[in-house]
From Swiss-Prot:
Function: Catalyzes the phosphorylation of the purine nucleoside adenosine at the 5' position in an ATP-dependent manner. Serves as a potential regulator of concentrations of extracellular adenosine and intracellular adenine nucleotides.
Name used for this protein in its record: Adenosine kinase
Superkingdom: Eukaryota
Protein species of origin: Homo sapiens (Human)
Effect of G30E: In HMAKD; the mutant shows some residual adenosine kinase activity
Higher taxonomy: Eukaryota, Metazoa, Chordata, Craniata, Vertebrata
C-alpha cells in the first residue's frame, strides 16, 4: 500500500511541469520604434489633420510634424512599438527568469537603435534585432490630448525586416521553436506578412498558442487580405472597440454591438481545432469583452481616479502584456484578464509604456 500512498506526489509534478516558466517561453515580433511623446493642443492636431484617438502611418504631409513636435512641445523619448511594449510588460510581470520573453524586429545602426537595444536589455527581454544601415531606426510621434493619443508611426527601419535574412536563420528560428506562446501585433502585417504566416503555421502545426492584435482600424481596412490569411491560425485575438467596429464593418458583420462582433469573430474559420479561438476587446474605461466558443463575458476594469491618469498611450499594449504573462503559465483566462487590467492600470499612471521596478499583482 505504501507505494499507492506515495503516488500522488509525482502525479502533481507532472501537471505542473509543462507550465514551468523558462527562457524564451514567449515570442514576439513587431516594429521596434522610439516613441516621441508630447502633450499637444488641438491646433497641432488640426494642422496635420490628425484624429485625437488614432494610429496611422506617416505620409509626406507629416514630414515636418516630427521636427515641430520636438521644437514646440516638451517631448519625452521612450522605447516603443506596440509588440515590443507588450513583450516588455509581460517580462516585467513575469520577473523571473530573465529573458522569458523574446523579441524580433528591425532597427537602424544609429543612436536611436542603440537606445532601443539598451532599453530592451534593461527590461530583461531577449531582443534579437535585424540591424541594417539603409534606413534609420523607426520613430512614433505620440500626440497626447487629455485621455486621447494620436500616433503617427514613421516605420523607416522597422519596415525593412526580412524573413530570409533574420527569421529563417537557424539561430533565430530556434527561439521561435522554444516559445509556447507567440504574439504579433497586426501592425507587422504591413511589414512582413510572410514572417507572420510562418510563425502562425508553426504554432498551429505544433499546438502552440498564436495570438494577434487588430492594432489599428487601417489594418482591417487596407491590409484585409493579409489579416484574413492569418486569421484561421489565430488562437487569441486582441483589439479595442474602435478596431473591432472597423473589423466588423469590413467583414460585413452588420452589427455595431461589441459583444456580437466578438461572437462573430470567434466563429470565423479556424485551422487548429484543438484550440477554440478566444476574442478579447478592450474598451478603455468600459468593460473588457471576451468571447469563447460557449459564451461572451464582460469584465469591469479597475476603478481609476481620473486625476491619476497621465498617459493612456500604451494601455492596450500593457493589457496584452499582462494577459500574456499569465497565459504562458497556463493560468485561467479570468486571471489573464485580471493581470491585463492590472498592467494597464499601472502604465496609464506613467508617461510612455514604462513601469515601476516590480509589479504588485497577486
Amino acid at each position: 500500500m505504501a507505494a499507492a500512498e506515495e503516488e500522488p506526489k509525482p502525479k502533481k509534478l507532472k501537471v505542473e511541469a509543462p507550465q514551468a516558466l523558462r527562457e524564451n517561453i514567449l515570442f514576439g515580433m513587431g516594429n521596434p520604434l522610439l516613441d516621441i511623446s508630447a502633450v499637444v493642443d488641438k491646433d497641432f492636431l488640426d494642422k496635420y489633420s490628425l484624429k485625437p484617438n488614432d494610429q496611422i502611418l506617416a505620409e509626406d504631409k507629416h514630414k515636418e510634424l516630427f521636427d515641430e513636435l520636438v521644437k514646440k512641445f516638451k517631448v519625452e523619448y521612450h522605447a516603443g512599438g506596440s509588440t515590443q511594449n507588450s513583450i516588455k510588460v509581460a517580462q516585467w510581470m513575469i520577473q523571473q527568469p530573465h529573458k522569458a520573453a523574446t523579441f524580433f524586429g528591425c532597427i537602424g545602426i544609429d543612436k536611436f537603435g542603440e537606445i532601443l537595444k539598451r532599453k530592451a536589455a534593461e527590461a530583461h527581454v531577449d531582443a534579437h534585432y535585424y540591424e541594417q544601415n539603409e534606413q534609420p531606426t523607426g520613430t512614433c510621434a505620440a500626440c497626447i490630448t487629455g485621455d486621447n493619443r494620436s500616433l503617427i508611426a514613421n516605420l523607416a527601419a522597422a519596415n525593412c525586416y526580412k524573413k530570409e535574412k533574420h527569421l529563417d536563420l537557424e539561430k533565430n528560428w530556434m527561439l521561435v521553436e522554444k516559445a509556447r506562446v507567440c504574439y504579433i501585433a497586426g501592425f507587422f502585417l504591413t511589414v512582413s506578412p510572410e514572417s507572420v504566416l510562418k510563425v502562425a503555421h508553426h504554432a498551429s502545426e505544433n499546438n502552440r498558442i498564436f495570438t494577434l492584435n487588430l492594432s489599428a482600424p487601417f489594418i482591417s481596412q487596407f491590409y484585409k487580405e493579409s489579416l484574413m490569411k492569418v486569421m484561421p491560425y489565430v488562437d487569441i485575438l486582441f483589439g479595442n472597440e474602435t478596431e473591432a467596429a472597423t473589423f466588423a464593418r469590413e467583414q460585413g458583420f452588420e452589427t455595431k454591438d461589441i459583444k456580437e462582433i466578438a461572437k462573430k469573430t470567434q466563429a470565423l474559420p479556424k485551422m487548429n481545432s484543438k484550440r477554440q479561438r478566444i476574442v478579447i476587446f478592450t474598451q478603455g474605461r468600459d468593460d473588457t469583452i471576451m468571447a469563447t466558443e460557449s459564451e461572451v463575458t464582460a469584465f469591469a476594469v479597475l476603478d481609476q481616479d481620473q486625476k491619476e491618469i497621465i498617459d493612456t498611450n500604451g494601455a492596450g499594449d500593457a493589457f496584452v502584456g499582462g494577459f500574456l504573462s499569465q497565459l504562458v503559465s497556463d493560468k485561467p483566462l479570468t486571471e489573464c484578464i485580471r493581470a491585463g487590467h492590472y498592467a494597464a492600470s499601472i502604465i496609464i499612471r506613467r508617461t510612455g509604456c514604462t513601469f515601476p521596478e516590480k509589479p504588485d499583482f497577486h
